[in-house]
Amino acid sequence: MKDYYCNQKFYQLKINAEKKVIYSCCRADQEHIDINWLKDNPGELFNTPNLIQERKSMLSNERIPGCENTCWSKEEKGMWSRRLQSENKEKITTLRNKPTQLDITLSSECNLSCSYCCKQYSSTWRKDIEVNGDYKGLSNHNDRYALNNFDRVLKKLSQKKRQQTTIADLVNTEIDMMADGLNSVTMTGGEPLLDHRFSDMIQKFKNTKSVVVHSGLGVSETVLRRGLDAMSDTQHKTTLCISAESIGKNFEFNRQGSNWETFLRYIDIIKEYDVAIQFTSTYSNLNITDYVKFNTMFHEY
């Protein structure tokens, strides 16, 4: 009999502050944050009625619909799933838990329009669609290449106004309440360094053992240094995980909005700070010719 248990639903939380949704595991289906419920249940963002029920179902070895597309259906085809990487890890059976692993997306603010990205992760991609219209023939890609009403609302709100909402305050309070119990934090975007809250957010995780910030370095030198100052002011070394996989003109094509020489200069600037460097690369037919060259150039990381 197949075992449908996965311990990630018991310790991992992903928050998308802009979309007002959470995920119990970064691959699970999203759940919209119920503002009224959270007001009445402070500190319980990781223990919503839905999450409690899903944990009960898992402990009863039931197949959870929220994990269908990313795990169950893939495993049935003999494919790898995220769940399989935690098969031999400790089994957690308590229903109410505090997350020990947090993945937070502050916003989709980003100055780049990378070739394999979309409006969900880049405001520049979204602006391109606003100006030039929806992409044709891509309607089956989960609304990534067409504007919806949520996008139109975002367009009207400045970053400051988005952060002055009830839901933003509630999420901020929840993060404060869970911060001390976190073992690892991952900050993604968009471009996290562009978010006005970045320095304050990093300070919430000052004592967290592992903090990883994902960046495309599509920012000004002033913004970069401000972010590096904040990342250096922590008890444990923060890691800056940089998105790149091409060199020269191909880099500038795939990372539209970037400049190769500026990118190299920024790498040297980062070395001045007490911040670790990693790279995350997307392998595709658009960068295959540079993949080996890039890895050779930055092999030390």
Regions found by a protein language model. Give the residues of each.
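Core AdoMet radical
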Residues: 99-109, 120-167, 179-196, 206-224, ...
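Catalytic cores of alpha/beta
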Residues: 285-299
